[in-house]
């Protein structure tokens, strides 16, 4: 959900806007034509002023506000082109007065909380207050669904750290971000957002136009392959396809190509990744345990790191240090098992409730690894957990076992 601004429909489905022509945005509704079109936000005339740039269709068309008269915004076309129904609209310089969670969003949420979904995402986040509002709405509906904050507005970038702290995961939504902010800033903003998410141990998704040419072509451009690889090297937890798999002609090929690029890049990164250096700040206990577990795994040449976790927090603390070893996120909670699929380097494993005796729980895990993962005798396994198991979110224990 979130406050996405859109134009309405045209009588003929689309129109061509020519540079220098006047074009009116109106809140009065009705079908549009070559001279006017409706918008879905009644307060927009009060939010904009003469001189503001208005971008349409992911920034491909640009208008400039000339005057505001009642419910109409008069503009002049600066960059023209074809414009079709329901395209997005953005005014980067304006403080848009739409609510962060719309009436439709709340109605959708009533249905979503009854479904077996794992995350809910909020578009056009402006500050941490937007996330708090959605979280309160979830709580009122009896849900603790984690929230993915889509970073695509300049206001969210300005309050990046508080937004990340308030969210459970983040998406670098480069489409609208590249309209709201200068396009030359987007690659650096991507790196900054990913780095901040790593610091906070929050999963981050990089999205939009990663393999855009594969909407119509069976192979990506070289630049797109580099884009995917660089997102992996930046430290993203996940990369996302949109039109490539939703409406493109080669959805399976797009997934296969992206997977191949990820695997090749991860193999390179695993070889080149330096050993973790000490942080220049005080760490929370769970974070310190995660870092220590990764260092211990390197020191004893462990084959795998195991995280015994109820909520998934223990596995996230491990993943933020990007260890060379795979992480097994072992949990008795099926929703945590699903949610951990988003986290870098974690292979989720669902199990029965943990034995309250930690020694017995470790023995069970080692036996599982020996039988199911085919670990050779003498292989080292680093295990992390929060004890007692009933106390969620308390990562405080490391153990090294030998298979």
What do the predicted segments below correspond to?
Residues 1-403:
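Non-catalytic helical/linker scaffolds that mediate oligomerization, partner binding
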């Amino acid at each position: 959900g979130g406050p996405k601004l859109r134009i309405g429909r045209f009588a003929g489905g689309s129109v061509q806007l020519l540079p220098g022509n006047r074009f009116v945005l109106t809140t009065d509704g009705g079908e549009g034509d070559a001279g006017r079109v409706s918008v879905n936000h009644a307060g927009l005339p009060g939010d904009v002023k003469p001189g503001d740039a208005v971008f349409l269709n992911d920034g491909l068309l640009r208008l400039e506000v000339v005057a505001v008269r009642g419910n109409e915004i008069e503009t002049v076309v600066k960059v023209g082109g074809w414009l079709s129904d329901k395209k997005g609209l953005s005014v980067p310089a304006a403080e848009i007065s739409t609510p962060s969670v719309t009436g439709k969003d709340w109605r959708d949420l009533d249905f979503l909380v009854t479904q077996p979904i794992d995350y809910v995402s909020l578009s056009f986040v402006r500050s941490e207050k937007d996330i708090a509002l959605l979280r309160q709405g979830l709580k009122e509906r009896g849900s603790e669904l984690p929230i993915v904050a889509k970073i695509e507005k300049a206001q969210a970038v300005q309050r990046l750290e508080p937004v990340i702290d308030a969210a459970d995961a983040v998406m670098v939504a480069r489409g609208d971000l590249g309209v709201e902010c200068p396009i030359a800033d987007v690659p650096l903003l991507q790196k900054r957002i990913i780095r901040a998410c790593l610091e906070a141990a929050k999963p981050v998704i990089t999205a939009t136009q990663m393999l855009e040419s594969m909407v119509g072509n069976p192979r990506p451009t070289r630049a797109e392959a580099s884009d995917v690889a660089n997102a992996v090297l930046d430290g993203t937890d996940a990369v996302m396809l949109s039109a490539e798999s939703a409406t493109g002609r080669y959805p399976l090929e797009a997934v296969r190509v992206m997977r191949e690029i990820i695997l090749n890049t991860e193999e390179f990164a695993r070889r080149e990744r330096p050993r973790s250096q000490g942080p220049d700040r005080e760490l929370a206990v769970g974070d310190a345990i995660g870092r220590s577990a990764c260092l211990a795994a390197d020191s004893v040449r462990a084959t795998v790191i195991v995280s015994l976790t109820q909520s998934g927090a223990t596995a996230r603390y491990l993943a933020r240090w990007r260890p060379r070893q795979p992480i097994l996120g072992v949990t008795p909670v099926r929703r945590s098992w699903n949610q951990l699929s988003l986290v870098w380097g974690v292979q989720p494993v669902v199990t029965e409730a943990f034995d309250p005796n930690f020694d017995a729980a470790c023995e069970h895990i080692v036996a599982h690894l020996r039988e199911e993962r085919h670990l050779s005798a003498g292989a080292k396994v680093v295990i992390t957990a929060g004890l007692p198991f009933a106390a969620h979110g308390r990562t405080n224990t490391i153990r090294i076992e030998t298979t």
